[in-house]
Amino acid sequence: MKPIKTLPLLLLLLGIIVGTFAGCATSASHGAPDSITSLEDFKNAKLGVVTGSVYDGHSKALFPNAKLAYYQTFADLFQCVQQGKIDGFMADEANFNAVKRVGADLSALKVPDLCVEVGYGFQKNARGEALKAEMDAFLATLRSDGTVDRLIEKWYGSAEPTQTLEKPDFSDNPTPISIAIDSSRKPFVYMLNGSYAGFEAEILYMFCEAYGYRPSFSGVPFASGLAGLASGRFDVVVGGLYVTDERAQSVHFSEPHTYADVVMVSHNAEEASASFFANFKENFEKTFILEGRWKQICKGIGTTMLISAASMVFGSLLGFLLYLLSKNSYKCISSTAKAIGKVYARIVAGTPIVVILMILFYVVFAKYKNVGSTVIAIVAFSFSFGSFVYRHMGVSVGSVEFGQTEAAYALGYSKTKAFFKIVLPQAMTVFLPSFCSEVVSLIKATAIVGYIAVSDLTKVGDIIRSNTFEAFFPLISTALIYFLLTWIVASLFNILKRKLEPKRRSEDVILKGVER
């Protein structure tokens, strides 16, 4: 059977296996009673906490014997508690009510004498202080004219907003402003019909329009947003940011726009659906059809392939150029290139690509806000891919017998012509298989670019997951799409390899241009 015919069977088999295990998933208690009726039931429970959130300290203080598990976003917590991975977690009541509106199987118990203040975060410098003063004045105006009350009813009320937030045209505004948004923080800010929406998002749009700012938005978790704020990459952080004395030492906070009670969220087994398959159609529609989310997925695929293709091209040029310089006739040039190549290859081999990515984003290009996240991702992966090309070009060219070069010289070829006409074509048959594997690895590795606010395929899947609070379809569809992309790329390279194999080429093709 040909490999191409096995693809549908593999996809079908994968879907059946994953669907079966997902359908068999059940909630499990980790020290808490099956039915939670009071806060006392959480004393020996497994509790979820968002890394760096204020609830870390509160959870430890209220439940010292509980086991804590740390997650990236509140959306992760809502999903994990429904799947039984944790028994509960702390959240603000506004966030809980917004998630509950979409039909999540959750219940909540209010934590006595505990509330949180939510505001906007700005840089701890003169510009940040000026922005804070403007935002405070703007919020005071919105409170006095009743706009805040109207927005509270709109975004915090019992009805789920369905209308896309109208975004003003900021293109003519003179002053740029870089904004980090954690879009997993419904109802403060989240994605609705492919655009940012929510209480904070609407106020932010009005603020930029009133003060003449031209915003650029970057979707990142709040912890990454705070890091970018400290490095100067962002001017504002938005996403249900809690105001605390500790954070105020490094962040200018606006006056709180929301005061919310804190609740302990747990899974409500009585409201749980009968089975996975009973909600299969509904979950499919929420993931792909509702709000045209399939369009977001297509854009994510395009971004992933753009980064992969550009990194492959620029990385190949970088690695090949460095290899040519290392073989230069002038010893000073070749020695320098070899030394650079050795250090370069060692740095890439010993440093995780995600660290390189974040260094470029938060340190090297922190002050260059006009350099987009996608460009930075291409630079990082080109840097990494170039190291592979440099190392493997040496191995591949070294596999060609030196007698081939001597024969070319005997025929009157120059050193350059002998390399490009005789040696390199033979080296390609050794180079291409590993090159193909590295390109496939490159495509999969780009899944981390969401760390620097690039809306690639994985990031889009996370955004959809944070809106639907369903993990199955966003994650499985992302995995299948990566599988298809890498399979297609590998198939194309296999075709190219077959065309370059001497045994498969006719005599006329091999001797083309040779006088007989």
Predicted regions and their residues:
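Pocket-lining segment of extracytoplasmic ligand-binding domains
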Residues: 30-103, 127-128, 278
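Short, solvent-exposed loop/turn elements at domain surfaces
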Residues: 57-58, 130, 186-191, 246
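Extended ligand-binding regions for polar small-molecule ligands
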Residues: 25-26, 53, 60, 95-97, ...
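Acidic, polar ligand-binding/catalytic clefts
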Residues: 26-42, 52, 93-117, 124-125, ...
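Bacterial N-terminal signal peptides that target proteins for export
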Residues: 1-10
